[in-house]
Each structure stands twice: as structure tokens, then as C-alpha cells.
């Protein structure tokens, strides 16, 4: 086992380390390409090339493998439905559907190209996110999910459970067949006041838990990402019992430090600390300021159960030297 692999897995388990691991990642394609890779191999090739360059230049402690191009869940019934009630009889695509198999092939290809042995976690979205993106064109759709709940919550739950079964199959296959170490499951509260915590737990959470349970069943080392994309705010308490080894959220916008998160998530490993946007310290700050922030995070959170990273994906044009500054300051 390589030193980096041993270091990261120790941190995932909350064990003692001699250096706090660091994990940052970004997209390798543009937002208008995220939904269209399944039918456009050029997008997948672009994603592969981006991973290769990133891993060679950053030499990361571990990597999140990006699912760019596969954001569109290819359920034919989603193309032209008038009401959520129209979808009450849909069935899963199946574990061997080409959309799933193509992602297994992607992960195999990416890992085969690694220049060293590092932990790799594959990006997976919550079932409701796949639905939301299709109806809301990537950013948006929360109001439509709330509309569906008002219209026919039983039908929506069925749809999410069906998607969840396929995403569970995808998670299992990328771990067991493709060789990734686990999944990075991205969840997000519905940004509509009509969707209470109770409704979320009843209608949406079961499909998310199905995915995590499948990944755990495949012996994955899994990260739960509570996504603050484009300013989304989350009810962190909704996710405190989700069975992931590592948890990541937007510490600034949510007003919950990593140290507080250790308590909320009952001592499970926490990941983050830096704002991810172009206005944040990681992107704009001096080496001194960035390294002072690293030491502050470590002093506040402790060295057990900590991985330093960002709220979400960082800008794709960031100077990779900045990531190395973080790693230098994380040596204990």
C-alpha cells in the first residue's frame, strides 16, 4: 500500500496521521457539456484528459473522479411528461444499462492511467438531483420538485426510488468492477420552503440512503457532500445520520465549522475548510494567508478525522501551486 493511500484511509477512519491529507478537485468540462457526454464521446475524452493533467501536475493525496458528461439520467419517460403522475409506472434502467456501463468503463480507464497508487472516489449525485437537473436544466428545478410533491408525492417517491435503484447499481459497479475506492454522494436540501424536513425525510431521503447503503455494501470508503452549489443553503441536521465515513459541506455559508461538524456527525471525519469560489482565500490569497488558514483549521478541528479541502469544486483555472501551499502547511 502506498504512503498516500495509507494516509488517506487512516484519515477516513479517524486515526492518527503525521500529515493532514488534502483534497481539492474541479470540473474538466463546461456546464453546458455536463448533460451530454453519453451521446458525445468528445466530452468524455475531454474529461479523461483533464484528469490526467490534474493528477500529473497536482500529485494529489487522493482524487475525486468527475462524472462530467453523465449528469443526464437517460430515462425515456422523462423526455415528454406532462405530470409527475405520468411516471408512476416507470422501472429502473437496470444495472447493465449502457449509461451505467459507460461510467464503469470511464472509471476503469481513469484509474488505469494513474501514475501512482492513490485513493479514488467517484462522483455520484442524489436521485432527486438527476431528476432536478433534467427538469431544471442543471441549475434550478427545486420549485418543480416542490410542485411534484404538492401534485402527487407518492408518484414522486416512486420516481426517486427507481432512480435510486439505478444509482445504487452504478455505485456498486464502480466500486466492485471499476476499482474505485468509494463514492462521493452529493446531496442538497430542496431550495423551496414547501419542502419541510419531514417531507424530505419521507419522500427524498430513502432514495439517497439506498445509494449509500449499496456503496457501503460494496465495502466503499464513501464521502457525503452536502452541496452549496450556486448559493444553495442546507439543513445540515437532515443528513447527520447518513452512513458515510466522511462528510463535506460549505462551512462559511452554512455557518458550521469543521469542529462543530465533528460533533454533529458524531466524530466522523470531516472534509473542507476553504471557500471554493473565485472570491475565496484559496483562489486569491497570498501563500502566507493560505498557510495561516490551514494552521487555523487544524488548531480548531484537531488532527484526527480531518481532511482539508473546499466547500465544493474549485475553479478550473486555479493555479495548482496554491494546492501545494495547503499541503505544505498541513504537515504536523
Predicted feature locations:
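Active-site loop segments of alpha/beta catalytic cores
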Residues: 1-29, 36-37, 50, 61, ...
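Alpha/beta catalytic barrel-like cores
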Residues: 25-32, 61-94, 98
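Active-site-flanking structural segment that lines cofactor/substrate pockets
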Residues: 33-58
Amino acid at each position: 500500500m502506498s504512503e498516500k493511500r495509507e494516509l488517506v484511509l487512516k484519515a477516513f477512519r479517524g486515526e492518527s496521521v503525521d500529515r493532514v491529507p488534502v483534497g481539492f478537485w474541479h470540473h474538466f468540462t463546461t456546464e453546458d457539456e455536463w448533460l451530454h457526454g453519453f451521446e458525445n464521446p468528445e466530452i468524455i475524452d475531454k474529461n479523461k484528459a483533464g484528469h490526467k493533467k490534474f493528477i500529473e501536475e497536482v500529485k494529489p493525496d487522493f482524487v475525486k473522479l468527475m462524472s462530467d458528461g453523465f449528469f443526464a439520467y437517460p430515462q425515456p419517460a422523462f423526455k415528454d411528461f406532462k405530470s409527475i403522475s405520468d411516471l408512476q409506472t416507470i422501472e429502473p434502467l437496470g444495472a447493465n444499462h449502457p449509461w451505467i456501463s459507460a461510467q464503469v468503463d470511464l472509471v476503469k480507464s481513469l484509474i488505469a492511467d494513474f501514475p501512482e497508487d492513490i485513493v479514488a472516489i467517484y462522483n455520484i449525485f442524489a436521485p432527486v438531483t438527476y431528476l432536478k437537473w433534467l427538469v431544471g436544466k442543471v441549475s434550478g428545478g427545486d420549485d418543480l420538485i416542490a410542485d411534484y410533491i404538492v401534485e402527487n408525492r407518492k408518484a414522486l417517491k416512486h420516481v426517486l426510488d427507481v432512480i435510486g435503484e439505478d444509482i445504487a447499481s452504478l455505485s456498486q459497479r464502480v466500486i466492485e468492477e471499476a476499482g474505485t475506492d468509494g463514492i462521493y454522494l452529493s446531496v442538497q436540501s430542496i431550495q423551496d420552503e414547501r419542502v419541510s424536513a419531514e417531507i424530505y425525510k419521507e419522500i427524498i431521503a430513502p432514495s439517497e440512503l439506498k445509494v449509500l447503503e449499496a456503496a457501503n455494501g460494496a465495502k466503499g470508503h464513501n464521502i457525503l457532500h452536502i452541496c452549496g452549489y450556486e448559493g444553495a443553503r442546507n439543513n445540515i441536521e437532515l443528513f447527520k445520520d447518513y452512513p458515510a465515513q466522511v462528510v463535506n459541506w460549505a462551512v462559511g455559508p452554512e455557518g458550521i465549522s469543521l469542529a462543530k461538524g465533528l460533533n454533529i456527525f458524531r466524530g466522523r471525519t470531516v472534509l473542507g475548510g476553504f471557500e471554493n469560489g473565485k472570491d475565496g482565500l484559496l483562489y486569491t490569497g497570498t501563500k502566507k494567508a493560505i498557510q495561516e488558514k490551514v494552521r487555523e483549521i487544524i488548531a480548531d478541528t484537531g488532527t484526527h478525522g480531518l481532511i482539508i479541502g473546499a466547500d465544493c469544486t474549485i475553479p478550473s483555472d486555479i493555479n495548482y501551486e496554491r494546492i501545494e501551499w495547503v499541503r505544505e502547511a498541513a504537515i504536523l
